């Protein structure tokens, strides 16, 4: 199952990186096909995970994939926690993201930033998966920050419009307030 969870989480990231780095050379059709394929793979796997955990009553998966950093007795690792709630959220996130990707084909048809936008929304999907599947507070925080960063990029995508710039600044400031509370909570949990 570990490979299924990894593939589910990494498929949108791979699509985002390919399109982000080579989208203009690939062209619009291939760019949106790559990102949609990555999210579609995640959606199919999310349905499989949902079936395994919720419908068949599979065991909770809580494993560290690797230790990222060790500071004294504090281990900062990357891992996944997949239970019934996570399985439901994976289906919701992947399905909604797939629908957004498909809708974006028509919505962005005349926009010069077509491939960049697809790269961003695919990256957003990966960030949401990392947030939903995290098995520790540090990874949860990094997932939260990644969602905030990509939200910032998407909200300010049309940076030539004054309203987009204002909304972007507002989202950035609101996220920083949330970050402070989040970090304070993590610090209190680690202290006690």
Question: Where is each model-derived feature located?
Answer:
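...captures the hydrophobic TM-helix bundle architecture rather than a specific catalytic motif
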Residues: 1-192
């Amino acid at each position: 199952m570990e490979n299924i969870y990894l593939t589910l989480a990494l498929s949108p990231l791979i699509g985002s990186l390919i399109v982000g780095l080579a989208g203009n050379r690939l062209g619009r059709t291939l760019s949106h096909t790559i990102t949609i394929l990555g999210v579609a793979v995640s959606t199919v796997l999310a349905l499989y995970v949902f079936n395994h955990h919720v419908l068949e009553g599979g065991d909770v998966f809580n494993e560290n994939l690797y230790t990222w950093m060790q500071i004294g007795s504090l281990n900062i690792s990357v891992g996944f926690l997949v239970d019934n709630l996570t399985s439901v959220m994976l289906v919701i996130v992947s399905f909604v993201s797939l629908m957004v990707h498909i809708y974006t084909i028509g919505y962005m048809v005349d926009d010069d930033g077509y491939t960049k936008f697809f790269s961003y929304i695919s990256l957003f999907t990966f960030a949401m998966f990392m947030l939903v599947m995290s098995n520790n507070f540090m990874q949860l925080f990094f997932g939260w920050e990644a969602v905030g960063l990509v939200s910032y990029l998407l909200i300010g995508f049309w940076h030539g419009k004054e309203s987009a710039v204002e909304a972007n600044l507002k989202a950035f400031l609101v996220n920083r307030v949330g970050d402070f509370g989040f970090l304070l909570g993590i610090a209190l949990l680690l202290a006690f």
